[in-house]
Amino acid sequence: MSKLEEIKKEIAKYDYVRLSLCDLNGTYRGQLVAGRHAASYLDNGLNLFEGVLLAGPRTEKVFIDHPKMFNFGSMLSYPDPDTLRPVPWVADGVKVAEMLCESRWKKGGVPQEACPRYVARKQLKRLDELGYKLYSGYEIEFKMMHRDTMEPVFYGQDAYSQRLLQKQCKTLLHIDKNLKDSNIDVERYHPEFGSGLFEAVTKPKYGIECPDMVLNLKQGLMEMSDVKDVVITFMSKPELDNKATGIGAHFNFSLWNQSGDSLFYDADAPDNLSVMAKQWIAGIMKHSKALCAFNSPTVNCYRRLHQPFFPSAIFWGIEDREACFRIKNDGPSGTYIENRLPSGKSNPYLIVASTIAAGLDGVIKKLECPPPGKTEKTENLPRTLSEALEELERDEALVDALGSELVTWFVKCKRDGEIAKYKDLQTDEERFAREKEAYFL
């Protein structure tokens, strides 16, 4: 029996299967299909509107000209059989599974090159062809509130408090058991420096498994909170108060060769960082203004940046929590880069893809890494989404690596589906109210 036939047999054990496609905003879109029919979609794909990747945060319609688009027709969303996993929290007594999908045009059956998962796999393939593997994980922050009052489940900045954690243990332990049963591996949880703010640290994974798992984690947290007495949000800045703590999603990653050796560690270097690590840092620093569009992809994200202890200036440093790129150099297995730019609303597939594209540019071109720390020549990150999108469009190397279709669609999605909604608003209070409507849930 082939692997595909084995998976089809496994699918038949479920009552229902969710077929989920990640759009440009990091939202799962798809359909729930009966388990007895689900296997056929592995061969034939699932019909969805051909522009669904472009949907805005609240499914605002964004349209783009493309030679393969025809009369607002359909494309095909194909499940990846390797992503089959149970989703135990959906309904008691009903067996539900999920598979993650990628989109293809009906004309010719070729990939939609703006599909975030496809773009991430394409960049991972570039690494594989060079003999490298990406090993990565996330620190996912989320804010938890009481559903009846919408007040945070705790106030203050009592980070790491076991007492605060204990008060929410019943909810968190229920959530984590379901996550574990769904093959979503969270290593640890703790309260963070902000009212109602928690962090979930995922177990690092190789390749596409990391962004797959992180999106499943975020989806699971929101879905389980929907049936509990709490509300969970990943909105970057859910309060108008500038002093309120923003919500991030730090991306930790390292490179390894096929023999299992760290490519970022060098025992003989004074700082234990290899030449490749320095070149990679140089690459992501060079492209950081453009990367900001993917790392902080909403209008609201820029309320989080340029605040104390949040990214503002473009520099790196060893164990430096004010740097955009915080470097850990604790031996071969503990040497990695912590990208502190990503917002809680960022799309993990696009973070992985753009990070690889920028880092490889540094390695291939052997870029020289500037010294760590901030100087008078240090440049700042963009202050608005509009500015970040302009930087992305200007970054020819990044556009070439990621593909013009992705960048064109992403920019169109953001300008027409989000930025345009704020042009008629006069006050910051009005703008924030619209941000909360768009990004809170």
Placement of each model-derived feature along the sequence:
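ATP/Mg2+-dependent ligation/transfer catalytic cores
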Residues: 1-188, 209, 213, 230, ...
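Beta-strand elements of well-folded, non-transmembrane domains
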Residues: 105-107, 146, 206, 257-259, ...
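Core alpha/beta catalytic barrel or barrel-like domain that forms the active/cofactor pocket
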Residues: 134-146, 182-202, 232-252, 291-299
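Active-site-proximal beta-alpha loop/turn segments in soluble metabolic enzymes
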Residues: 144, 152-162, 195-210, 239-246, ...
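Short, contiguous, pocket-lining structural segments
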Residues: 163-171, 188-194, 206-217, 221, ...
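Acidic/histidine-rich catalytic neighborhood
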Residues: 247-271
